[in-house]
Every structure is written in structure tokens, then in C-alpha cells.
């Protein structure tokens, strides 16, 4: 069982920075026009800018850019000074050095210069103007303005002073005065480009973008070499959404001076935001070529590599940036972020701690550091660090959201829910909190609330990959598999490396039956994240289902190495070992598995052991019920949301049968085809008394084209293919419309089940029967059809259903119809030999021609058998025909693989091993063979002189204690062997190894391959005794072996699955084959193996009881079942509550 779909708790990296501005390295342009362009693609129109500006993280980037520029003006000027040497700089270069915000004109040469008195000293206007510029460049705006005012008072038309006053007032936020000085400058010289550029800054700051653009454009028109104006124009164009023109403006600036590495870096930022990563990369590389010590370009180039998935190159460039500038805070943050994504957690912690050394009260860095602690499993440390981030920045929704994630991981779900709500209180559009709160609601079973929250998260942020994946998981749970696939694909489109989405989509594809596509998804998830334990576990499960045990064990083991505390992987790995009988550390493994299940049930989690596997482990009845109940709840939850607001299904009228209608019974199964369940019950629909019941069969699987399916379709009054109605709600509506009185669940939790249909209650009475050997644990199932031996009242606490007893056994087999050619047999022997009657056998549907041969002799044995439904004990005479002919030619035929031969002149026989090749439908049991089939021990390498003990069950039903009993039996029965099946083949080496370790000669264990149905049953005649598996009996295989007349030894335990064989044997009238203890089990088998007369008598008794008892009597079974179903309806009809129906049947003493 693969783990139920993983719900991504989106642990957002708080305030993750992208491209970084160079502190102090930006050429003159307005501080409020950051060099970062909004995220988007090339050619984004202005109409789409609003959406682009909402890109997660964009606002943080812009604010960081602005804050960096404002806080580092002095450093900016220093960096520019390093780029352009003041001594010998060109006029254009001198212009770039004047101010980070405003453009100033060069002083106009005047002769002679007027003077002003400064600090009692007479100075020229030129000297005072220079002093004003120096103070401005140092950020000393008050002193700069004082000097400018002295000049202005003396010369109101001094153009450089007017421009400088405009710049000073812009920096000090006196925007109106800044605008007035710019207008005065234009009045003085209407061709002054700098004045128009500064006026553009004013309009941009006031939000009048069009006016700003007009002034910037006029500035560059007046002065085409005006770099400052081009940069300001580029920033304004970005704000207006005209990204292509902004790129052009940057290019124009760089054509004037290609060595402006800061401008080139800003152009790279814009190109990156437009999705033009390769062009951005060229810009950053050119900036680094121009100035190799330019740390910002190294950091920005790291951002590009990170966006392209080149994680190691990104790490290298961020590390280079912090090497060049050890105080580069943003580079440390980016380095920490990319190391976190690469899951290099220790180095990520170091990077974040270095950032905190530079800025100890940086809430964002505390938040990111907490995320790493969370990923490392240091939950308490993560919680403390998130709380520190919140203390530093109380209005921090991301931190509240991530704190909630950590609290939830710790098990503090209530507190986690409160933190998500706090995040949403601070920011109602916080999509992460919507998503994560939905996860909690989903785990609480509040599917409707969860769905609403996921949809809300996607409404806020349609590109939210985790929310798409989580919504898909709910859709999968509801059976809307195609819709789920669409959302998983959308999640992967948004986040191509979203490993969880790939893994979950694999689960959905597996459920849809597309195993190859599911494997591809799991492998892709592992390729993305080799440490993704869930994906390894899911891949293991699909290998397990396909019987690829080596691959399954390897993948489960890998999952556990990656995640030692992984209950699903541990329990599934334990089941794999059980399947192949690998019992190393068996007791320890089983104890741990039981503890895992008990812990999960205590915490009200879905257990990691599937209901159908729970019978294999020493779990309490309460635990098995709880496991089943959890799965029943999943079925109920899946359909509950679908039916909200719909009219409840209308049941058949309570008095419809009383008013003359026949009782309508509906059999529901996915196994109407070539499946053991159909092999058992295919004749029942046709043998029901149609004067009493009206039979409906509802198939959950498509037509497999076999005769089994055809027989059921033809002999049922109504056969409905529900596989063509995939919607459980509509399927339930169909059943309700058919007016079914009693609906019978034949699947339980086996493959192909649709218990969701039963959860919708389409019938007033719903019953478990035959196909699933345990309780459903479901409140929507009323009865389980069983018997007093299989389910004595003392074990009623093992079921949520009420017990409804059949009078003999609840089990049935169609062998008398399906395999009637095995009703009789002829033993073939050489004259004068004492070969056993189980060495060489002939079977055919018509024995008369063989029995007429003169070579036929008769062996007669008297025995006592039960007869009929009243189980009357009667004497019976077994007459066994023996054909005495030379057997050597037959043995040669078998050794050479010859298909047919003449035993006598007119008697052609067929090698029984050739049935599959010669008659396919006869081999599968769909048709009765029309030839004489020869079955020999030689065909299976079984010695003629040996006592052959057999077991044809799947090997997972064997446990160490069972094999220990079998070894003891072999040790006490000379010349005995144990005949098992390679079911699966991987179990053979482990069983042989176990036996050898306990001193048993490995040659005494014989394995055969799994065979088609007819051969599988027929070859059972070659065994002397069948040894049943107490842990989980042979159910269908028990019926198979008994049909061949072979005695079966069993021992009932406490589970239903462990008591079926006992019920069969009691119904057959041979309770002496049922042991109460392990010692008795061994004793019964040893006596059969060592006492030839006792064995012969027991074989005769079983052989005769097949046809005299009710065990294989389908007609009688139908009559008994009709009585029982009628009693259920009578109780309902009279308004009586559901209760046990025992019909005073008593459980035999000691059972």
C-alpha cells in the first residue's frame, strides 16, 4: 500500500531575495525607480503590469532596492568615484558624479566672478558653488543649501545653483520647492536638459508618470549624450510597463559609455525579470569583465544560474560575491537560500548566521534560518527562531505561517491553526496560510472546508504549485482522478522540479491502472530529489504489486535509510519479507510493526498496515476493526462531499416483499471473470430459486471475455456493468433505482473494490460475503454472512457487522459444475505392484468407456460419511477403479514431453501438462476437458514411494511456527516430502534455507510452478495429505484440495481467515482433521503419514463426502442463503434492529 498522497505544507522561504542592487554603484537616477524590473517575460504590456507587480517577492525586492540605495548614498558615490576618476574625467563623467537623484548643469564661466561673504571671508561665487557641490555629494544637504542660497541671493539666474537647489530639495522631500527651482532653471535656459530631467523626477515622484516621461524624453532629445536622463527614463518606462523601451534606454546609456558596469548590471536585472536570462547573463559577465571586484554582478549572476537550475554555479557566484564583499548582506541571504534549496543545510545555516552577524535584527534572515532548522528536523529550534523573527517584525504573516508549520509538525495542531489564522488576519490574501490551513482541515476530515481554502489560495495566486497539488490530492480522494491529474500537471508546469507533485501524480496514475506512467512519475520525483523517501516508497509499492519483490525491497529499504521513522515503508517492507518468507529478525520485525500500528491508532492516523494484511500479524480484534474502520471512513469521506445538497437515495419499500414482490438481492464484485471468487460462486445466480429472489449482479470490472463472465451475465436475471459508471454516486443511484433490498459486498478491501458505493447506502440492508475474510469496520455494512464454526459468538467482538449464520458453512465452491471431470478418477498401476493410489491418475468427464475395459479392477473401501443438509451419518462404499496396464510407456511419454499417446488400442490419453497448450479454455476452467487427462507424480518430480504432504497456498500464509510444525512432521514420517508452490518464486530460497538451518535435507522440499486453474486443482490428487496454514487458511485452495479427495489438516486460531478450513472440514464431516493445538496438528499429520490404513480410510471418507455432504452442493447453498437473506429482510420489515442471526446454531465444543 502506498502512502496516501503527501500534502505539501508549503514552507515558504521568507523574504527570499532575487537580483540585488549594488550598494552605491547605481549611476544617477531617481531612488524610487529601482533597477530591478518586475518579474515577467519579454514584451509585457502596460495592461499586464498590475499582475506582474503582484509576483510573490517583487514588493520585497523593490523595497530592498530602495532601502539599499537610501542607506548607502555615501558608499554609492565612493563606488562611482572608483569607476570614474575625478581627475581628468570628461564633462559627461563629471556630470554623472553630481547626485544620485538629480542632474546638475556645469557652472557657466563668468568673468569677473561676483563675491559673497562666507564666515566673514569674501569668496567668489564659483568657490561657494564648489563648496555647495561638495557638501551635497557628502549628503550634507543643510550646508549645501546654505551655500546655494548665498549664491542665489547674489545671482538668482545662476543655472548650476538652481539645478543644485532642485536636487537638494528633491532629496529632502521638499518636492514643490524642487519643482520650482527646476522651472526657474528652465526659465533661465529652456534648452537645459538637466532641468527637464529633474522636473521629470518630480512628476514621477508625484505619480504623474506621463509628464515624467515627456520631460525625460525632452532631456535626451536636447542632450543625446545625457546618460543620467537615459537611466531615469529607463526607470520610468519600467514603472509604466514599457519594458522593451526601458531596455532601449539602458542600451543608449551604455552606447555612450560601455564601461558603466553598474548600469549594465541593472540592465541585466531588467532582462532577467523579462525572462531573457541568457541576455541578462551576458550583461552581468560584461560588468564583471569591466570590474572583476564588482560583488553585486557576481551575486546577480548567481541569481540567473539559480533560475536556470544551475545550483552549483549559483552557489559558486554567491560565494564569490561574499568573498569580494564580506559585508554583502543580500549575497549571504541569497547564498543561504540556494544552499537551503540544495538541501546543504549546514552551509545554509552558516550563511544565514553570517548575515545575522551583519544585521542581527534582520527578521527575514531569522525566518529563513528557522526554515532550515525545520528542514533539519530541529523543530523546537525552528519554533524559537520563528518566534524571534515575529518579535522583530510583529506584522510578519510569512513567519506566522511557517511557525504554524513547525507547530503542526510537533503535533500542536490547535496552536498551528491559530497561527495560520493570525497570518490571514495580518494578510487575508496570504495564499500559503490558506493552503496550509486547508491541510489541517483535510486531516480533520473537513474536506469541504479544505477544498474551499485550496481554491481560495489558487484564486489569490493561480501559479501556486503546492495548492494545485494539494487540491489534486483531494480530488483523487473523491475519485475525480482525471481532474486530479489536470491539477498535478498544472503544479508541475508551474514548478517543473516539484517532486511531490510527480510522486502524487504517480499515485493517481497507479489508481487509474497506468503503472508504467506511475513508475515514470516516481522515477522523475527521485531524479529531482534523490532523498525523497516517499517517492522511493511509492515506487516500491508499485513493484510490490507487480510481484517484483527484489526491486520493492530495495526501494523500501532506501526509503527507510533516508527516513528511518517511516511507518508506511517499514510495514510494507515487512509485508514484502512475509511474501517471500524472509524471516530474519521475524519476531523483532513483527513486534515493531504491531507497535507502529498501535501508535498510529492511538494518534488517530491511518494505519500503515492494510486491512487485508492485518490478519497476518498478532493484532488484537480491536486493532483490526480500527484499521478497517479507518479505510471505511476514507470511503465515506470520498463520497460525502459529492452528495452534499443532493436528495438522499430512496430505498426499496419496506413492505414491497410482503406485498408480493420477490426479494431483490444485488451481488457487487470486481471479480466477475477469471478470478477465484467467480470460480467459487459462478453458478449461484443461476441456481437461485427465482420464485423467491430476483438476482442482480453488479460488475465493477470490465468484461474480460471469459466464460466465467459470460455464465454470470447469462444466468443472472439482471447483470449491470458498473465499470461503465465510474461515478460512485451515479452507480449508487442505479442500484437504488433497481429497488435492491439486500446489497452484497463481495470485495471488502480487495483490489477493485468500490466501497464508496456502499457508503452511499443504496440499499436498506448491506451485507459482507465470501470475497473478503474479515470485518469491514464500516458503519454502512449491517451483516457478515458466516457460520458458527468460522465466527462463533464469542468472537463477535471481532466484527462491526452482526453475524448472520449459514447452517453449514458460509463457504461454497462450484467444483461439481466447473470441474466435474474430477468427480471420478481411475488409478493407473502396473500389475503386481503396490503403488499408491496417488501416483498416476486418469480423469475424464465420461468414465464409461474406461470402466468398460477388462483391465479395470476395483478397490473397495467401506467408510462412514455425513449426508445431506441434516448431516446424517451413513455408511458408504468407495469403489476405486484401477487400470492395470504397463506404466513404463506412460513414464517415457512424460519424460519426453509427448502430448498424447495410446494406452490401449482405442484409448488415447493426454499428458496433463499439455492442457494449457492444447485447450486454453479447458486449462482455465472455463470449459470441461473433453479428453482423458493423465496426471503423474513424475510430471512434478514427486517420488512414487513417498508420502507427499502439500500446501498450494501463496507463501505469505506461512510463518516460522507453521514451517517448524511441517519440519517436525517430515522428521517423524519416513520418506515423506513437502510439496509447495513457487508462489512467489522468490520464496523458495528462503524456505529451503530455513529448513536446511534446522537440519532438514533440502531434497525433501519440492517446489512446482503456479499452474492454470484446471491443472492446479487436478494435480492435488497426487498429494496424500494437505497441510493447511493456520495463520491464514487456504480458502479457495482448501476447496480445491478437498475436491480432489485429499485430506487437509488445519488448526483454527482467532481470526476469520484462520478458521475457514475448519468450517469446510466440519461441513464435509471430517472434524477429526481439525487440531486444537500445534502438537495435535503434528500428531494428526504424522498418523496419516505413518498409518497406511488410516490414511486410506481418511482419503476414502473425504472422497465420498465431497458428493454426499453440502460442502459442494450449490443448489442447497442457494436455498440456505435465500432463507438467511429472507430472515434479514423480515427483521427490517418488522422494524427490528440489526442483530445476530444464529438460528440456534451452536459452535462445536472447543472451537
From Swiss-Prot:
Gene3D superfamilies: 3.30.720.150, 3.40.50.11380, Glycogen Phosphorylase B, Tetratricopeptide repeat domain. GO terms for biological process: dauer larval development; energy reserve metabolic process; glycogen metabolic process; glycoprotein metabolic process; lipid storage; protein O-linked glycosylation; reproductive process; response to temperature stimulus. InterPro entries: OGT (IPR037919), OGT/SEC/SPY_C (IPR029489), TPR-like_helical_dom_sf (IPR011990), TPR_rpt (IPR019734). Disruption phenotype: Cells lack O-GlcNAc post-translational modification and brood size decreases with increasing ambient temperature. Reverses at a speed similar to the wild-type but for significantly longer duration following mechanosensory stimulation. UDP binds at residues 954, 957, 1010-1013, 1016-1019, 1034-1036, 1040. Pathway: Protein modification; protein glycosylation. It is found in: Nucleus; Cytoplasm, Perinuclear region. GO terms for molecular function: protein O-acetylglucosaminyltransferase activity; protein serine/threonine phosphatase activity. It catalyses: L-seryl-[protein] + UDP-N-acetyl-alpha-D-glucosamine = 3-O-(N-acetyl-beta-D-glucosaminyl)-L-seryl-[protein] + UDP + H(+); L-threonyl-[protein] + UDP-N-acetyl-alpha-D-glucosamine = 3-O-(N-acetyl-beta-D-glucosaminyl)-L-threonyl-[protein] + UDP + H(+). TPR repeats lie at residues 125-158, 193-226, 227-260, 261-294, 295-328, 329-362, 363-396, 397-430, 431-464, 465-498, 499-532, 533-566, 567-577. The keyword DNA-binding does not apply. Keywords: Cytoplasm, Glycosyltransferase, Nucleus, Repeat, TPR repeat, Transferase. SMART domains: TPR (SM00028). Its EC number is 2.4.1.255. One of its GO terms (cellular component) is perinuclear region of cytoplasm. PANTHER family: UDP-N-ACETYLGLUCOSAMINE--PEPTIDE N-ACETYLGLUCOSAMINYLTRANSFERASE 110 KDA SUBUNIT (PTHR44366:SF1). The TPR repeat domain mediates recognition of protein substrates. This is UDP-N-acetylglucosamine--peptide N-acetylglucosaminyltransferase. It comes from Caenorhabditis elegans. The gene is ogt-1.
Amino acid at each position: 500500500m502506498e502512502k496516501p498522497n503527501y500534502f505539501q505544507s508549503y514552507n515558504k522561504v521568507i523574504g527570499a531575495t532575487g537580483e540585488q542592487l549594488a550598494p552605491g554603484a547605481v549611476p544617477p537616477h531617481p531612488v524610487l525607480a529601482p533597477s530591478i524590473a518586475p518579474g515577467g517575460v519579454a514584451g509585457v504590456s502596460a495592461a499586464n503590469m498590475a499582475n506582474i507587480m503582484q509576483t510573490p517577492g517583487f514588493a520585497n525586492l523593490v523595497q530592498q532596492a530602495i532601502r539599499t540605495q537610501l542607506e548607502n548614498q555615501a558608499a554609492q558615490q565612493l563606488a562611482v568615484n572608483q569607476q570614474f576618476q575625478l581627475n581628468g574625467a570628461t564633462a559627461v563623467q563629471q556630470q554623472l558624479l553630481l547626485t544620485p537623484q538629480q542632474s546638475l548643469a556645469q557652472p557657466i564661466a563668468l568673468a569677473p566672478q561676483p563675491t559673497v561673504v562666507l564666515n566673514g571671508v569674501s569668496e567668489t561665487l564659483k568657490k561657494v558653488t564648489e563648496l555647495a557641490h561638495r557638501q551635497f555629494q557628502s549628503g550634507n544637504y543643510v550646508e549645501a543649501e546654505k551655500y546655494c542660497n548665498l549664491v542665489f541671493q547674489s545671482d538668482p539666474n545662476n543655472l548650476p545653483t538652481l539645478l543644485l537647489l532642485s536636487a537638494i530639495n528633491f532629496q529632502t522631500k521638499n518636492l514643490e520647492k524642487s519643482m520650482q527651482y527646476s522651472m526657474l532653471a528652465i526659465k533661465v535656459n529652456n534648452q537645459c536638459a538637466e532641468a527637464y530631467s529633474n522636473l521629470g523626477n518630480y512628476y514621477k515622484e508625484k505619480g504623474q508618470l506621463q509628464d515624467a516621461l515627456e520631460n525625460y524624453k525632452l532631456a535626451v532629445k536636447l542632450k543625446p549624450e545625457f546618460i543620467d536622463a537615459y537611466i531615469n527614463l529607463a526607470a520610468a518606462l519600467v514603472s509604466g510597463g514599457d519594458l522593451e523601451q526601458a531596455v532601449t534606454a539602458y542600451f543608449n546609456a551604455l552606447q555612450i559609455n560601455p564601461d558603466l558596469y553598474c548600469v549594465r548590471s541593472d540592465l541585466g536585472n531588467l532582462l532577467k525579470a523579462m525572462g531573457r536570462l541568457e541576455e541578462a547573463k551576458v550583461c552581468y559577465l560584461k560588468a564583471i569583465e569591466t570590474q572583476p571586484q564588482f560583488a553585486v554582478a557576481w551575486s546577480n549572476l548567481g541569481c540567473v544560474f539559480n533560475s536556470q537550475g544551475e545550483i552549483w554555479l549559483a552557489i559558486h557566484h554567491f560565494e564569490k560575491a561574499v568573498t569580494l564583499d564580506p559585508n554583502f548582506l543580500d549575497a549571504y541571504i541569497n547564498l543561504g537560500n540556494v544552499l537551503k534549496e540544495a538541501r546543504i543545510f549546514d552551509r545554509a545555516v552558516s550563511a544565514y548566521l553570517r548575515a545575522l552577524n551583519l544585521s542581527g535584527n534582520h527578521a527575514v534572515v531569522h525566518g529563513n534560518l528557522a526554515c532550515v532548522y525545520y528542514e533539519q528536523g530541529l523543530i523546537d529550534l525552528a519554533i524559537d527562531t520563528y518566534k524571534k523573527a515575529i518579535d522583530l517584525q510583529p506584522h510578519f504573516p510569512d513567519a506566522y505561517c511557517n511557525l504554524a508549520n513547525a507547530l503542526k509538525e510537533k503535533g500542536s495542531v490547535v496552536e498551528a491553526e491559530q497561527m495560520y489564522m493570525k497570518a490571514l488576519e495580518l494578510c487575508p490574501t496570504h495564499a500559503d496560510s490558506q493552503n496550509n490551513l486547508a491541510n489541517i482541515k483535510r486531516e480533520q476530515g473537513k474536506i469541504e472546508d479544505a477544498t474551499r481554502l485550496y481554491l481560495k489560495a489558487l484564486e489569490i495566486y493561480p501559479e501556486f504549485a503546492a495548492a494545485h497539488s494539494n487540491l489534486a490530492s483531494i480530488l483523487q480522494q473523491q475519485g475525480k482522478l482525471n481532474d486530479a491529474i489536470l491539477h498535478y500537471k498544472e503544479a508541475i508546469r508551474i514548478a517543473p522540479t516539484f517532486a511531490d507533485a510527480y510522486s502524487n501524480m504517480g499515485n493517481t496514475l497507479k489508481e487509474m491502472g497506468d503503472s508504467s506512467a506511475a513508475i515514470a512519475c516516481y522515477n522523475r520525483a527521485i531524479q529531482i530529489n534523490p532523498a525523497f523517501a516517499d517517492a522511493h516508497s511509492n515506487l516500491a509499492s508499485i513493484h510490490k504489486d507487480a510481484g517484483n519483490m527484489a526491486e520493492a525491497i530495495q526501494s523500501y529499504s532506501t526509503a527507510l535509510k533516508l527516513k528511518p521513522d517511516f511507518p508506511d515503508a517499514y510495514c510494507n517492507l515487512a509485508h514484502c519479507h512475509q511474501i517471500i518468507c524472509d524471516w530474519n529478525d521475524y519476531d523483532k520485525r513483527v513486534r515493531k510493526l504491531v507497535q507502529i500500528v498501535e501508535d498510529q491508532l492511538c494518534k488517530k492516523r491511518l494505519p500503515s498496515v492494510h486491512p487485508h494484511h492485518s490478519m497476518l500479524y498478532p493484532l488484537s480484534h480491536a486493532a483490526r476493526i480500527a484499521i478497517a474502520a479507518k479505510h471505511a471512513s476514507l470511503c465515506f469521506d470520498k463520497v460525502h462531499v459529492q452528495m452534499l445538497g443532493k436528495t438522499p437515495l430512496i430505498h426499496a419499500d419496506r413492505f414491497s416483499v410482503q406485498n408480493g414482490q420477490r426479494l431483490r438481492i444485488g451481488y457487487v464484485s470486481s471479480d466477475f471473470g477469471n478470478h477465484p471468487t467467480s470460480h467459487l460462486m459462478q453458478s449461484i445466480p443461476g441456481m437461485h430459486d427465482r420464485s423467491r429472489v430476483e438476482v442482480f449482479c453488479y460488475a465493477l470490472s470490465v468484461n474480460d471475455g471469459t466464460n466465467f463472465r459470460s455464465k454470470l451475465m447469462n444466468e443472472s436475471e439482471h447483470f449491470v456493468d458498473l465499470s461503465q459508471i465510474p461515478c460512485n454516486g451515479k452507480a449508487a443511484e442505479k442500484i437504488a433505482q433497481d429497488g435492491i433490498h439486500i446489497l452484497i459486498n463481495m470485495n471488502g478491501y480487495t483490489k477493485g473494490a468500490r466501497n464508496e458505493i456502499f457508503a452511499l447506502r443504496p440499499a436498506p440492508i448491506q451485507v459482507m460475503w465470501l470475497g473478503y475474510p474479515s470485518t469491514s469496520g464500516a458503519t454502512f455494512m449491517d451483516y457478515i454472512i458466516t457460520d458458527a464454526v468460522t465466527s462463533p459468538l464469542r468472537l463477535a467482538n471481532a466484527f462491526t457487522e452482526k453475524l448472520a449464520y449459514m447452517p453449514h458453512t458460509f463457504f461454497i465452491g462450484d467444483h461439481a459444475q466447473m470441474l466435474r471431470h474430477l468427480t471420478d478418477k481411475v488409478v493407473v498401476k502396473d500389475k503386481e505392484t503396490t503403488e499408491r493410489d496417488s501416483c498416476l491418475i486418469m480423469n475424464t468427464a465420461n468414465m464409461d468407456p474406461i470402466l468398460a475395459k477388462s483391465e479395470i479392477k476395483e478397490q473397495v473401501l467401506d467408510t462412514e460419511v455425513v449426508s445431506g443438509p441434516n448431516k446424517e451419518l451413513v455408511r458408504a462404499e468407495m469403489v476405486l477403479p484401477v487400470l492395470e496396464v504397463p506404466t513404463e510407456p506412460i513414464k517415457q511419454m512424460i519424460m519426453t514431453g509427448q502430448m498424447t499417446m495410446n494406452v490401449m488400442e482405442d484409448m488415447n490419453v493426454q499428458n496433463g501438462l499439455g492442457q494449457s497448450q492444447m485447450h486454453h479454455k479447458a486449462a482455465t476452467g472455463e470449459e470441461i476437458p473433453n479428453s482423458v487427462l493423465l496426471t503423474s507424480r513424475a510430471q512434478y518430480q514427486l517420488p512414487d514411494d513417498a508420502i507427499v504432504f502439500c500446501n498450494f497456498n501463496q507463501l505469505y500464509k506461512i510463518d516460522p511456527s507453521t514451517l517448524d510444525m511441517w519440519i517436525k512432521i517430515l522428521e517423524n514420517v519416513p520418506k515423506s516430502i513437502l510439496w509447495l508452490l513457487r508462489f512467489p518464486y522468490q520464496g523458495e530460497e528462503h524456505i529451503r534455507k530455513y529448513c536446511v538451518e534446522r537440519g532438514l535435507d533440502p531434497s525433501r522440499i519440492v517446489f512446482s510452478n503456479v499452474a492454470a486453474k484446471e491443472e492446479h486443482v487436478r494435480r492435488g490428487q497426487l498429494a496424500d495429505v494437505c497441510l493447511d496454514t493456520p495463520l491464514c487458511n487456504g480458502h479457495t485452495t482448501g476447496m480445491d484440495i478437498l475436491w480432489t479427495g485429499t485430506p487437509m489438516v488445519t488448526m483454527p486460531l482467532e481470526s476469520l481467515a484462520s478458521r475457514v478450513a475448519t468450517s469446510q472440514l466440519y461441513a464435509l464431516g471430517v472434524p477429526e482433521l481439525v487440531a486444537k493445538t500445534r502438537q495435535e496438528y503434528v500428531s494428526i499429520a504424522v498418523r496419516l503419514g505413518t498409518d497406511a490404513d488410516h490414511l486410506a480410510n481418511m482419503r476414502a471418507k473425504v472422497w465420498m463426502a465431497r458428493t454426499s455432504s453440502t460442502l459442494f452442493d450449490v443448489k442447497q447453498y442457494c436455498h440456505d442463503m435465500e432463507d438467511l437473506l429472507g430472515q434479514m429482510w423480515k427483521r427490517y420489515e418488522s422494524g427490528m434492529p440489526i442483530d445476530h442471526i444464529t438460528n440456534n446454531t451452536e459452535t462445536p465444543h472447543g472451537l
